[in-house]
Amino acid sequence: MAKEKKEEVKEEEVSEATSTEGSTDVESTNNDDLTTETQATTALDDIKKVEAERDELSDKYIRAQAEIVNMRRRNEKEQASLIKYDGQKLAKAILPALDNLERALAVESASEQLLKGVKMVQTDLLKALKENHVAEIEAEGQAFDPNMHQAVQTVPADDDHPADTVVQVLQKGYILKDRVLRPAMVIVAQ
């Protein structure tokens, strides 16, 4: 009988141990499932963060590339403008001398030799300016253009000179290609 009791006690211990181990295995399986789900959720969140960072960096990269292209275009445009108008400073410096030559030619009492010499200088200056794309602004009889003309006086309009027409040029204006070096000083009909 003592043997039977010992066997019963052992069987009860084994069954208790088995049931305890079984419940521990179920709890462990449930905990493993929860841990796996948590890890999966965390991994998905991390992936979303990394994708957002990637998208942001990609956007910054594209914007930086566009800015570089814009800077390059701006630089090329400035270089072309510098090349196009490289003689502007020289042309502006020559214009007053040309004006003085024209005034000297306008004096009637000068000797013929002096007049001939001054006329040759004027011709050479005009030729040099023309070769460097400097041209006189046509003004007299033209419609007044504030970009090309500087009105210094107005006169009443009449049949010969309608309103907003240049009546007389007081000082010639000049352009370098399409840029105004000096506007023509004019009298305008109002």
Swiss-Prot record:
Signal peptide coordinates: none
Database matches in Gene3D superfamilies: 3.90.20.20, Head domain of nucleotide exchange factor GrpE
Location in the cell: Cytoplasm
Main location: cytoplasm
BP term (GO), one: protein folding
Any Pfam family hit: GrpE
InterPro entries hit by this protein: GrpE (IPR000740), GrpE_coiled_coil (IPR013805), GrpE_head (IPR009012)
Keyword DNA damage in record: no
Region called Disordered, residue ranges: 1-40
Keyword Transport part of the UniProt annotation: no
One CC-aspect GO term: cytoplasm
Keyword vocabulary terms for this entry: Chaperone, Cytoplasm, Stress response
GO molecular function: adenyl-nucleotide exchange factor activity; protein homodimerization activity; protein-folding chaperone binding; unfolded protein binding
Ranges annotated as biased composition (Polar residues): 22-40
SUPFAM superfamilies linked to this entry: Coiled-coil domain of nucleotide exchange factor GrpE, Head domain of nucleotide exchange factor GrpE
Stated family: Belongs to the GrpE family.
Protein function: Participates actively in the response to hyperosmotic and heat shock by preventing the aggregation of stress-denatured proteins, in association with DnaK and GrpE. It is the nucleotide exchange factor for DnaK and may function as a thermosensor. Unfolded proteins bind initially to DnaJ; upon interaction with the DnaJ-bound protein, DnaK hydrolyzes its bound ATP, resulting in the formation of a stable complex. GrpE releases ADP from DnaK; ATP binding to DnaK triggers the release of the substrate protein, thus completing the reaction cycle.
Subunit structure: Homodimer.
NCBIfam families found in the cross-reference section: PRK14140.1, PRK14156.1, PRK14162.1
Name under which the protein is recorded: Protein GrpE
Source species: Pediococcus pentosaceus (strain ATCC 25745 / CCUG 21536 / LMG 10740 / 183-1w)
